[in-house]
Structures are given as C-alpha cells and as structure tokens.
C-alpha cells in the first residue's frame, strides 16, 4: 500500500504497521474482500472500535485512525466512529520528552542511551545491577546477529536481540564483539554467561547513567521497533502476518516479550506497544 504526502520515515513505518495489522483483521473478519476499493468506511470504523474495545489506549487508536484515513482515502473522525478522546492525564508515564528529561544533557549519555534503545535493557543493566553490562555481555552469532546477555529482574537470564538499525553504533561502542555459537538450551546459555562474567574482570561498559533519564521510554520504543522488525522478517520469509492477539501477531509478540524479559504478551501490549 502506498500513500502520498508522508514525509517522515517514522510515520511511514507506523502507517505500514497499521496497514499490516488491519489487513490481517480484514482477512479474518471479511474474507470476501480481495482489493482495496472493496473496503468500506464502516469496516474501518468497525476495526477501530474493536481495537478500543480490546482495551488499547486512546493514543493507539488515535494512531491507527489517520493511518487508515490516509491509506484508504477516508475521512473518519473520532466523533463519527464513537472513539474516546485522548486525555492528557491518561498519557503513559513514558513520553518522548518528560519534564525531568530536560534536566540532563543527552550528549553526556549518548552511548548509554544508544545501548538502552538498541537492546531494550532495564536501567540496572546499564548501571548498578549485579550483572551490569560488560564487553563480554555482547556477542554475535555466525549469521551476524548481535545479542546482549542480560540477568535482570528476579535473576532471570535472557539473550536480547540488538535492533538491526543500531548494529553499527553498537559495534562502535564494543569494537571487538565475540563471535560464537549459541548453546542449545537457555540454562546452558545462562551458566556460560555467568561464568564468563565472573572471570572477565571488573571493567564495565558504562560508569554513569543519571536517574533523570526515562529508561522505560527506551524499552517501550525498543518493543515497537522490535515488533516491526519481526513483522518485516516474517513477511520477507513469506509468512502470514496474523492479528490473532489484540490486533497483533502473537508469534512476533512472544519474541518481543522474551527480548524484554517478561515472557507475557499481555504485558507487552498493555505497557509497551501503546
């Protein structure tokens, strides 16, 4: 689907994600539709109302509405579709710029911020945690994919995928990333990493990270970027993108959930994808 008048790369990606999710829903709910000009405004409104009924925030539904209007050349408004208005008081705690975010200079924490955005790690991994990241925390498989080994909340271990768009920046932060074969089980991965971490010496990647930085915002952005990345990978492999969990592809959500260290897809949708 192509729509004129989109000049922002981020807007393009957001609209594309909405189009993919809407198409998945349409295939299940209205299988007789084969071409775009068969789609009616009523069906688009039905989709938006369904998203709202599933508990998505006003922000998420507000994001979908202009995307469908642009793609399908509709002029749906919230009043017509009986959609809730977005309230300032209900905006999630992690906006792109919060008041306290303005009290620090991002340039002083450029590498830390890049790392957090690229990996979706919690604050404790950047600074202060038992397994605060070291150079040995980051590794690459034989396909060139980069991962970071993390032990965070509750002592849970995971290998989180580094977003492809940050790959070059991560390689600058850690110039000589170890290449290795992943182990067959998560338990073996955890054991190997903890031994490596214990014997690797005291050098950490970062020595400071102000609490004024809203790290949760970076995790939320990581979740959205990672989901989009997985959708694109699945499409590239000719896989079918489903809307089988609250408008999202369940398999892609599961991987995002693992990368975030939750392993609960409802948490991803309710706290990160909005």
What are these regions (language model features)?
Residues 1-86:
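N-terminal core-binding DNA-recognition domain of tyrosine recombinases/integrases
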Residues 80-106, 154-165:
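DNA breakage-rejoining catalytic core of tyrosine-based enzymes
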Residues 96-124, 247-250:
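Basic, Lys/Arg- and aromatic-enriched nucleic-acid-binding interface segment
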Residues 116, 127, 257-258:
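The alpha-helix within a helix-turn-helix
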Residues 128-172:
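Conserved tyrosine-mediated DNA breakage-rejoining catalytic core shared by Y-recombinases
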Residues 133-137, 262-268:
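Short, basic interhelical loop/turn and adjoining N-cap
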Residues 163-231:
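Active-site/catalytic core of tyrosine-dependent DNA strand-transfer enzymes
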Residues 217-262:
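C-terminal catalytic core of tyrosine-transesterase DNA break-rejoin enzymes
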């Amino acid at each position: 689907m192509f729509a004129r008048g989109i000049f922002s790369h981020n807007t393009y990606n957001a609209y594309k994600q909405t189009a993919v999710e809407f198409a998945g829903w349409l295939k299940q709910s209205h299988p007789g539709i084969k071409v775009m000009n068969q789609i009616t405004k009523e069906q688009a409104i039905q989709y938006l109302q369904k998203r709202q009924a599933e508990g998505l925030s006003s922000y998420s539904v507000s994001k979908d509405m202009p995307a469908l209007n642009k793609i399908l050349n509709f002029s749906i408004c919230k009043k017509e579709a009986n959609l809730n208005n977005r309230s300032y008081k209900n905006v999630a705690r992690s906006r792109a710029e919060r008041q306290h975010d303005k009290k620090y200079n991002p340039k002083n924490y450029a590498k830390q911020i890049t790392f957090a955005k690229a990996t979706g790690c919690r604050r404790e991994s950047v600074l202060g945690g038992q397994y605060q990241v070291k150079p040995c925390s980051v590794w690459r498989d034989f396909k060139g994919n980069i991962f970071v080994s993390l032990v965070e909340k509750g002592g849970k271990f995971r290998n989180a995928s580094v977003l492809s768009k940050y790959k070059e920046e991560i390689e600058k932060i850690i110039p000589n990333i170890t290449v290795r074969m992943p182990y067959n089980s998560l338990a073996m991965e955890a054991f190997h990493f903890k031994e490596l971490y214990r014997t690797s010496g005291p050098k950490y990647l970062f020595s400071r990270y102000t609490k004024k930085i809203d790290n949760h915002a970076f995790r939320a952005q990581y979740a959205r970027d990672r989901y989009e990345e997985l959708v694109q990978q699945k499409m590239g492999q000719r896989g079918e993108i489903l809307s089988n969990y609250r408008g999202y592809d369940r398999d892609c959500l599961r991987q995002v959930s693992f990368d975030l260290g939750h392993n609960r897809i409802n948490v991803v949708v309710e706290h990160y994808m909005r």
